[in-house]
Amino acid sequence: MLPLLAALLAAACPLPPARGGATDAPGLSGTPPNASANASFTGEHSTPRLLASAASAPPERAGPEEAPAAPCNISVQRQMLSSLLVRWGRPRGLQCDLLLFSTNAHGRAFFAAAFHRVGPPLLIEHLGLAAGGAQQDLRLCVGCGWVRGRLRAPAGAPTALPAYPAAEPGPLWLQGEPRHFCCLDFSLEELQGEPGWRLNRKPIESTLVACFMTLVIVVWSVAALIWPVPIIAGFLPNGMEQRRTTAGAPAAAPAAVPAGTTAAAAAAAAAAAAAAAVTSGVAPK
């Protein structure tokens, strides 16, 4: 009777498996392991390991992205009629994307330009201007990031198990690189008073050219007034010809004038002597 009761109790209440037996080592027994139990067991041990590795490993992207966004530090200067010089602060990031487009065309950009991975300062040339000199409002947006390239873990370093399938390697613009954009609204008419616009100030070259041309005009004006003088003087009667004619005639001795004669008498005597000399030179031989 007792052996029968012992057999019934053993059949009704099976003993739990001992540790280290075939149940703990599914590879040693021919039966496949329990999938649900194995998954729960693995999950219980892998979750703390993931948390520990994530807490111990330093973040791949340092604090500049987690810091609050810096205020917009963007300045725009007008260099020429259709060019702009843009500057922004380095704390916004290492590599920046710049967008420039017009905003006063009722939802349609009259002019738009994009620059990828540029640094300050940036010169934007061939700026589209509105027809008829109309007011043109523009918006400038600068977005910067702190990633220079794909960050790779050092060889042999333990890595956490990914919770999702890893993305295939590719360009950063395909990986959704974060950008912090900061925009500035301005008008081209407001930039005309900027000191950087060269059209509002006279360069030294223009001043020198103006001075040189003024000097040339003055010299030519003086020369134009002087050069006709010798030509006009050639048509005037020359006193040298009369002197040569008088020297070629025989010199007549002037008559002696008494000391007591007056000036009128002396002049009359001189005129008579001159007439006699002319008459003697013209008389036929």
Swiss-Prot record:
Function: Receptor for brain injury-derived neurotrophic peptide (BINP), a synthetic 13-mer peptide.
Chief location of this protein within or outside the cell: membrane
Repressor listed as a keyword: no
Protein name: Transmembrane protein 158
Transmembrane segments: 215-235, 263-283
Family that this chain belongs to: Belongs to the TMEM158 family.
Signal peptide, first to last residue: 1-20
Gene: Tmem158
Domain of life of the source: Eukaryota
Database matches in PANTHER family: TRANSMEMBRANE PROTEIN 158 (PTHR38324:SF1)
UniProt tissue specificity: Detected only in the brain.
Subcellular location: Membrane
Membrane topology category: Multi-pass membrane protein
Record's comment on post-translational modification: N-glycosylated.
A single GO cellular-component term on record: membrane
Recorded GO MF terms: peptide binding
Keywords: Glycoprotein, Membrane, Signal, Transmembrane, Transmembrane helix
Residues the record marks as carrying a glycan: 73
Annotated region described as Disordered, given as residue ranges: 20-43
Keyword Zinc-finger assigned: no
Skewed-composition ranges (Polar residues): 31-43
InterPro entries: TMEM158 (IPR038962)
